[in-house]
């Protein structure tokens, strides 16, 4: 399946559910308490992040989609912190604030990137379902997807009225379910239980075929449009009536924290479906996003640039021939990993041993090598009639096949100054016997603190000589 970045800016989503505040106390531990055999944490940083349904809305906004949120809080500083964080992220939030009840807070004590303790401050909310339904109905206009983010904390009391209200307007309903009774989600377009939640309803699944059979039966029993079971390190499985099961492997390279991974899945699904993507493509994007977010510590959101870079890697543009936009994204990703970018340029009309040796030497100056290639018109202007021998597409394809080369891009001008000013490599490399100041673009690179290097050419290796020899023979 070919992945592409949706137009999230045209995908408004409404989230309704249990909001909470994820609070982190970070500090160092260097001694054991004299009062009890427990570590003493000297707190030096307090961090608040939206959690639960608020994290779903935050994830949707981080992807660039317009996000609205309806939830229930207390009348306290935790609710104020939530409201401020969401407003800063561009999320429109409407809270039903209840006096004499605390906003749900999950406090985690962290040291050296390890969670030592979690303390929960919560009481089940006594909400007004009619008032909440009225708020939802007023915000459904113009929305393309409704998300029910259910943590079983009391914000969602009348699931069916919300599902039916959205369906009456032709709005898909996605639900992240909770509890032992999934009948409350009857008629939803899609529900996204994890494997444990799914098996609580249908019983233990002995193998994949059993999971599929039980899932299809649940689809029919609850009149669901689709069912997505998230399965941790085994990826996720999408089930639809009359369609083959779609199994997607897990994408995580390293797992640091699974907190909020389910929120990332449903938020990416919702934003992608709202943007007009079909369900298999939306699920593939959600799987990719989940693989990124579990590599982060704590409740975290995935940004649009992160997802775009992941798509580029997935589609094979981590290496090879790129356009300028793809190249700039690849460079951003490389720099995020502290990689040094090397740049060289030329016509590379007939690739020979001298070129290969030179490119290997250039690659050794850093971690990633960009080769910028003159297009056909500029080669003709530089080299004269009859050149190039090979078209720019063929020249770039050959260069992209070399192990020393990471990215290849063409440029139309006679010199690469315009490209250099946008790419801003750490090292500019040129082959020849002239001084550094004579290298075209050296002034641009040196102006922002980059390095310019001149490498010697391999003797008796020349494209011009090869062309002349061919013509004589």
Curated annotation (Swiss-Prot):
Family of the protein in this entry: In the N-terminal section; belongs to the carbohydrate kinase PfkB family. In the C-terminal section; belongs to the cytidylyltransferase family.
PROSITE patterns: PFKB_KINASES_1
Name of this protein: Bifunctional protein HldE
Annotated EC: 2.7.1.167, 2.7.7.70
GO molecular function: ATP binding; heptose 7-phosphate kinase activity; heptose-1-phosphate adenylyltransferase activity; phosphotransferase activity, alcohol group as acceptor
InterPro entries found in the cross-reference section: Bifunc_HldE, Carboh/pur_kinase_PfkB_CS, Cyt_trans-like, PfkB_dom, RfaE_dom_I, RfaE_dom_II, Ribokinase-like, Rossmann-like_a/b/a_fold
Annotated catalytic residues: 263
Subunit organization: Homodimer.
The protein's role, per its UniProt record: Catalyzes the ADP transfer from ATP to D-glycero-beta-D-manno-heptose 1-phosphate, yielding ADP-D-glycero-beta-D-manno-heptose.
SUPFAM superfamilies noted in UniProt: Nucleotidylyl transferase, Ribokinase-like
Domain of life from the UniProt record: Bacteria
């Amino acid at each position: 399946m070919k992945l592409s970045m949706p137009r999230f800016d045209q995908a408004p989503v409404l989230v309704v559910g249990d909001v909470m505040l994820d609070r982190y106390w970070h500090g160092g531990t260097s001694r054991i308490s004299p009062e009890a055999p427990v570590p003493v944490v000297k707190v030096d940083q307090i961090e608040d992040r939206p959690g639960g349904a608020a994290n779903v809305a935050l994830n949707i906004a981080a992807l660039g989609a317009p996000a609205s949120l309806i939830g229930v809080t207390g009348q306290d500083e935790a609710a104020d912190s939530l409201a401020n964080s969401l407003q800063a992220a561009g999320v429109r939030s409407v809270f039903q604030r209840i006096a004499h009840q605390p906003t749900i807070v999950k406090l985690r004590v962290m040291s050296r990137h390890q969670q030592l303790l979690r303390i929960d401050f919560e009481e089940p909310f006594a909400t007004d379902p009619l008032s909440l339904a009225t708020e939802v109905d007023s915000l459904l206009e113009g929305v393309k997807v409704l998300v029910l983010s259910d943590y079983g904390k009391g914000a969602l009391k009348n699931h069916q009225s919300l599902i039916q209200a959205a369906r009456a307007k032709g709005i898909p309903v996605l639900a992240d379910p909770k509890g032992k009774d999934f009948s409350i989600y009857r008629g939803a377009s899609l529900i996204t239980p994890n494997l444990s939640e799914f098996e609580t309803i249908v019983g233990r699944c002995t193998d994949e075929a059993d999971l599929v059979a039980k899932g299809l039966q649940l689809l029919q029993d609850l009149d669901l449009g689709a069912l997505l079971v998230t399965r941790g390190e085994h990826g996720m499985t999408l089930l639809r009536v009359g369609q083959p099961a779609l199994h997607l492997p897990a994408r995580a390279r390293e797992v640091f924290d699974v907190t909020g991974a389910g929120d990332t899945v449903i938020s990416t699904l919702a934003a992608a479906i709202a943007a007009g993507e079909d369900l298999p493509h939306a699920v593939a994007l959600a799987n990719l996003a989940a693989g990124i977010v579990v590599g982060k510590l704590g409740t975290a959101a995935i940004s649009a640039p992160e997802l775009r870079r992941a798509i580029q890697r997935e589609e094979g543009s981590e290496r090879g021939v790129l356009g300028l936009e793809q190249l700039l994204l690849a460079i951003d990703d490389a720099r995020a990993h502290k990689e040094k970018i090397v740049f060289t340029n030329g016509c590379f009309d007939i690739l020979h041993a001298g070129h290969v040796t030179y490119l290997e030497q250039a690659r050794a100056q850093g971690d990633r090598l960009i080769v910028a290639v003159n297009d056909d018109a500029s080669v003709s202007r530089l080299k004269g009639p009859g050149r190039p021998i090979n078209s720019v597409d063929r020249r770039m394809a050959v260069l992209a096949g070399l192990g020393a080369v990471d990215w290849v891009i063409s440029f139309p001008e006679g010199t690469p100054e315009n490209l250099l000013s946008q790419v801003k490599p750490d090292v500019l490399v040129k082959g020849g016997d002239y001084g550094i100041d004579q290298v075209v673009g050296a002034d641009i690179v040196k102006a922002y603190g980059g390095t310019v290097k001149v490498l010697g050419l391999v003797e008796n290796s020349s494209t011009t000589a090869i062309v002349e020899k061919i013509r004589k023979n």
